[in-house]
Amino acid sequence: MGCTLSAEDKAAVERSKMIDRNLREDGEKAAREVKLLLLGAGESGKSTIVKQMKIIHEAGYSEEECKQYKAVVYSNTIQSIIAIIRAMGRLKIDFGDSARADDARQLFVLAGAAEEGFMTAELAGVIKRLWKDSGVQACFNRSREYQLNDSAAYYLNDLDRIAQPNYIPTQQDVLRTRVKTTGIVETHFTFKDLHFKMFDVGGQRSERKKWIHCFEGVTAIIFCVALSDYDLVLAEDEEMNRMHESMKLFDSICNNKWFTDTSIILFLNKKDLFEEKIKKSPLTICYPEYAGSNTYEEAAAYIQCQFEDLNKRKDTKEIYTHFTCATDTKNVQFVFDAVTDVIIKNNLKDCGLF
């Protein structure tokens, strides 16, 4: 008889080898697939991070795609100046030049009649005159007392360019656009031989119940916090300080039993706005017990500690914190490179190779 295998046995061995090979390949493929969940309160910069991934890893926005953002740029610009004018009434701030009151009335008429994606020379002129007014500027400087888009000054200062008839938004203009995210936006890209799937989840509280089914098997959570929110209240709740809301949400995510083995990456975002704001608005508005100086370094480090201290499993769970400016492509590229290295290291650990 000897040890020769029958044709049937040989086929079984081949089948077994093939199954092993497929399992190995599936395992390697799974190890290369990274699911990232972007979480954070509303307007913390999640969608801007997603846009940066497209710019950094997918050759950015085509001219055609940029053109599609023209209507959003105009809408954001008009809504910003309207928000400031409305706030002037509430805050009892007068126009520096009384002639601007006519421009304000004209603004509401022209904005109401404006065709989507177009800005007439007349409307642009009205907005420009209003924006230059000392009373409007005084109201803008008190924007923490009402809801105003972060991109307001960016667009209003550049009105000459964006009001041109042949205007096409730049990548930076697109990054600065603000559209409330509803539902879940999924983005795919490849970087350092890893296949990323990034999920951007609607930040406002009414949207949070939609997150839950995204959570299973995520590699890491990127949690965005707007540092500059320390002196603001929520859009959905005029009583709740935005930073406190962020901390509450971070606590519930960081210490959630589902995420015991999930890497948590904390993006303390809008560091550029925070650096400007901390010179004028003390940190004690948010943290009355804070006794440090109102310098960027000391105040930012204090906020970092406030979030990291919420981690109840410090011995087994590490929080990877980065200070970011989501509208700065170079900064996001640098930070995301570091984040990817952490993910690779943790993946190797999970496979027993590190």
UniProtKB/Swiss-Prot annotation:
Its EC number is 3.6.5.-. One of its GO terms (molecular function) is G-protein beta/gamma-subunit complex binding. Residues 324-329 are annotated as: G5 motif. GTP binds at residues 43-48, 151, 175-181, 200-204, 269-272, 326. Changing G42R: Abolishes switch to an activated conformation and dissociation from beta and gamma subunits upon GTP binding. Abolishes interaction with RGS family members. Residues 32-354 form the G-alpha domain. It is an enzyme of class 3 (hydrolase). The modification ADP-ribosylcysteine is found at C351. PROSITE patterns: G_ALPHA (PS51882). The keyword Nucleotide-binding applies. It is found in: Nucleus; Cytoplasm; Cell membrane; Cytoplasm, Cytoskeleton, Microtubule organizing center, Centrosome. This is Guanine nucleotide-binding protein G(i) subunit alpha-1. The gene is GNAI1.
